[in-house]
Each structure stands twice: as structure tokens, then as C-alpha cells.
Swiss-Prot record:
Gene Ontology terms describing biological process: mitochondrial ribosome assembly; mitochondrial translation
Disease as annotated in the protein's UniProt record: Combined oxidative phosphorylation deficiency 36: An autosomal recessive, multisystem disease resulting from deficiencies of mitochondrial respiratory enzyme complexes and mitochondrial dysfunction. Clinical manifestations include sensorineural hearing impairment, mild developmental delay, hypoglycemia, and intellectual disability.
Region called Disordered, residue ranges: 274-296
Function of the molecule: Required for mitoribosome formation and stability, and mitochondrial translation.
CDD domains listed in its UniProt record: RPS2
One Gene Ontology cellular component annotation held by this UniProt entry: mitochondrion
One GO molecular-function entry: structural constituent of ribosome
Keyword Membrane listed: no
Subunit structure: Component of the mitochondrial small ribosomal subunit (mt-SSU). Mature mammalian 55S mitochondrial ribosomes consist of a small (28S) and a large (39S) subunit. The 28S small subunit contains a 12S ribosomal RNA (12S mt-rRNA) and 30 different proteins. The 39S large subunit contains a 16S rRNA (16S mt-rRNA), a copy of mitochondrial valine transfer RNA (mt-tRNA(Val)), which plays an integral structural role, and 52 different proteins.
Gene3D superfamilies, sorted: Glucose-6-phosphate isomerase like protein, domain 1
Record protein name field: Small ribosomal subunit protein uS2m
Amino acid sequence: MATSSAALPRILGAGARAPSRWLGFLGKATPRPARPSRRTLGSATALMIRESEDSTDFNDKILNEPLKHSDFFNVKELFSVRSLFDARVHLGHKAGCRHRFMEPYIFGSRLDHDIIDLEQTATHLQLALNFTAHMAYRKGIILFISRNRQFSYLIENMARDCGEYAHTRYFRGGMLTNARLLFGPTVRLPDLIIFLHTLNNIFEPHVAVRDAAKMNIPTVGIVDTNCNPCLITYPVPGNDDSPLAVHLYCRLFQTAITRAKEKRQQVEALYRLQGQKEPGDQGPAHPPGADMSHSL
């Protein structure tokens, strides 16, 4: 009995010291999360993980392709300074209605009416169209807003034709900031808001301009000489009263959105075709020297 009780501490390892090499190994080892293997998860689960990783890489390639080009959607060719002039985009309001933040965009004054610099308008309009096309390419929700009754029918038809949304009626304050309380927790806010008119009347800014700035929603807006461009992410100085100018804006935005959605379909089809021809290839998606922005 004494012998068994004396052997019991040796069996349990009481008083035993770990070798020094194991202590050094434990001190240098850094724990990291173990990656599940096929043996632990099974072949079906491992196949699902591989398919999800492949789909993620596929989507990343599609989304990153337009970022490799400065003008992937060729929006620069949609208009010219001459076309802006013919649509009377350069005509502003009287000098007495001028907003002080619009002075950098004014070329001069003629017969007490401000004249907008069309060179700056062309630059800002190209940036706005390019951003809108990128948003449509990434399947974002685009909302057109205007309070001008004269162009309500035109804007609603344009938004419907390009597969987007429009709001041309009275805009209730808090529809963006309190959207979860008004419409439920599953509501999705627009990814981009385009203001074809940023004023409710000649002096009152649209309520959605302020709410979009509070919710960090990017905005594109046509700002006349009596508008405040500070809260607009991509302001486009131009006439927002002439029917020719508003028709031009609608045509340009509709063309940019439609072209971006068509490019998305073409790029997806091209990558799927290349994936079928070269399975498992992680190289460049298109041959060196090929410019997809002009080939699609």
C-alpha cells in the first residue's frame, strides 16, 4: 500500500519540471486561429467555402475594373461646350439674386444678368456624370429629386426609363433622417441623390439637400446663380429654369446610367467567358495592352 501511494505522485507528474526547450518554444509561439480543413469540415462544406471565395474574387475583379481608367464610361464624349451653349446652360439669374458662393462660377454679367462660365460647367458636369455612372455600375440606388412642377413628368419618365427612382412631389422633412421609424428597419436609403433643382422656390433650399448631408448621402445637383452649392457633393453650375437645359441634363444622366449598366453586363459576360476558358487562372483579366473602356 505504501508503494502504491509513493508511486502515485510520479504517475500524476507532481513535482516534475518541463524541459527548458519546451519552455522556450512556448514563449516564442504566437497563437493564431486555425483554418478549417477539408478533413474537419467535409468535402461539401469545403466546396462551398471555395465557391464563396471564387465568387468574391469574381465580384472584386468586376468592381475594380472601372477604377483602372479615368473615363471608363466615356462620358466626356456625351456633350461639348457648344451643346451646353445651345441649351442655354450659361444663362443665370439677375445680379441681384446672386448667391455669394456662386461667384467663382460666374463668367460675367450681361444686361444685369449673370453669365455662367461654361468651361467650369463642362468640368463639373463630367465629374458628376462619371460618379453617377460608377454608382449605377455598382448597382446603387439613384434617386432624382425636383420640386419644379413644369418638369415633373419629364423627370419621372426619365427615371423609369433608366430603371431608377424619382420624387417630384412635396418632400416631407425627416424622410431620410427618420427613415427607419417611418418605413421600418429594413428600409434602404438611396446611394446617390441627383437634384435637378436644388430650390423649392426662388430662395428656399430643398429639404432633402440638408437631410442628405446629415446622412452622408452623396449628391449631384444643378446649381443656378441663386443657389447655395456648399452642401452638394458634386455641384454643376448651370441654368435650371430653361426647358432646353433641363432636357439636356435628363438626357445626359439617362445615357450615363444606361451605359454603365450595359458595361456591367458586358464585363460580367467577359469575365465568365475567360473563367471558362482558363479555370483557376489568377493572372490579368484581359490581355496586356487591351483597353476595356473602349472595347466594350
